[in-house]
């Protein structure tokens, strides 16, 4: 079955939590891109400033949605994938080329646990569709695709030209496009004079300024119900990203399969319910918040601190398949529990949180 961004709706309600010394003037606009709900809320920004700035940002999102779509026939990404599958180099523009270069860098940082070159694997599992059937791939087809080992390391760049040493490379940027877009929307709003806003693209969130006299607050969804399990305060420039098994998934023979495909073995069987990261301000905070949650969704706990460090991240929350929840030392004081899980423990390998 398909679950359409329950988290996004939850965040919309929780970001308006009480606690301000004064009530700010809020203005909000919504849209639907990248297969999910988008909400941009401004605080104490005149509507004649907020409205055109947000409209321009939403227009950019609509354009990126079409250009970066992994299975639309008319998308720029599909055109590139077709050329690579035919063994041909292909020219693109600076915007897409820059994104692909970032994808290669992020994949290397993630030690292959984030691999945007496995679009064929995602399609084989049936997730290149707005709705999908509960069907496992044919084992032989899955084995052949895994043997071809598509990787971002196969991709080469020469000016605006993209080529691949491996015809099995097929780009699917769904694991980074929302975060990449967050950074660009934030830049557009800042340039338009919007100093305080909360940008929510399907649960990937970036805060600008504050909500009146207090920071923005967002809710963190409990993976197995439609309620918030915690609230997290976001300061200016911080970004929050979650990868979970509860948005796009199906169940078959008692096993939950989600759209997050493990690049190591091609499995969609979920070993973890969710991985959440909080990223400090920076020009790529949104991108890192989106990407870093993927390797942390797959990696064993012993590797979490090291992998998070490769993205300069200290704030991590994991929910295991049995609901056991783990937090890094820095994340502990940031989480305000509404429904505290039965088991909560501290992840090892991180530096202690500053006092």
Annotate each PLM feature.
Residues 2, 11-355:
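Mature catalytic core of soluble alpha/beta enzymes
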């Amino acid at each position: 079955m398909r679950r359409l961004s329950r988290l996004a709706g939850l965040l919309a309600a929780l970001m308006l939590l009480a606690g301000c010394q004064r009530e700010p003037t809020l203005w909000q606009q919504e849209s639907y891109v990248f297969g999910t709900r988008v909400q941009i809320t401004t605080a104490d920004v005149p509507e004649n400033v907020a409205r055109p700035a947000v409209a321009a940002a939403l227009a950019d999102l609509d354009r990126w949605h079409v250009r970066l779509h992994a299975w639309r026939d008319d998308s720029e990404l599909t055109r590139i994938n077709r050329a690579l599958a035919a063994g041909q180099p292909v020219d693109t523009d600076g915007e897409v080329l820059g994104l692909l270069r970032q994808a290669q860098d992020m994949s290397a940082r993630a030690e292959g646990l984030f691999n945007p070159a496995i679009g064929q694997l995602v399609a084989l599992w049936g997730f290149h569709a707005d709705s999908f059937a509960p069907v496992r791939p044919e084992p032989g087809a899955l084995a052949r695709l895994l043997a071809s080992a598509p990787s971002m390391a196969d991709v080469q760049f020469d000016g605006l030209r993209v080529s691949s040493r491996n015809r099995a490379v097929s780009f699917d940027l769904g694991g980074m496009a929302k975060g990449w877009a967050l950074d660009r929307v934030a830049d557009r709003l800042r340039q338009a004079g919007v100093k305080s806003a909360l940008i929510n693209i399907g649960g990937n969130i970036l805060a600008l300024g504050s909500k009146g006299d207090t920071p923005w607050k967002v809710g963190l969804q409990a993976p197995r119900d439609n309620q918030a399990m915690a609230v997290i305060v976001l300061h200016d420039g911080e970004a929050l990203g979650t990868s979970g098994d509860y948005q796009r998934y199906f169940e078959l023979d008692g096993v939950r399969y989600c759209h997050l495909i493990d690049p190591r073995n091609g499995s969609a069987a979920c070993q973890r319910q969710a991985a959440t990261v909080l990223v400090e301000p920076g020009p790529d905070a949104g991108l890192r918040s989106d990407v870093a949650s993927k390797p942390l969704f797959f990696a064993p706990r012993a590797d979490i601190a090291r992998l998070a460090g490769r993205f300069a991240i200290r704030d991590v929350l994991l929910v295991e398949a049995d609901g056991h929840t783990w937090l890094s030392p820095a994340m502990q004081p940031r989480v305000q529990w509404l429904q505290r899980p039965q088991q909560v423990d501290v992840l090892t390998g991180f530096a202690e949180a500053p006092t």
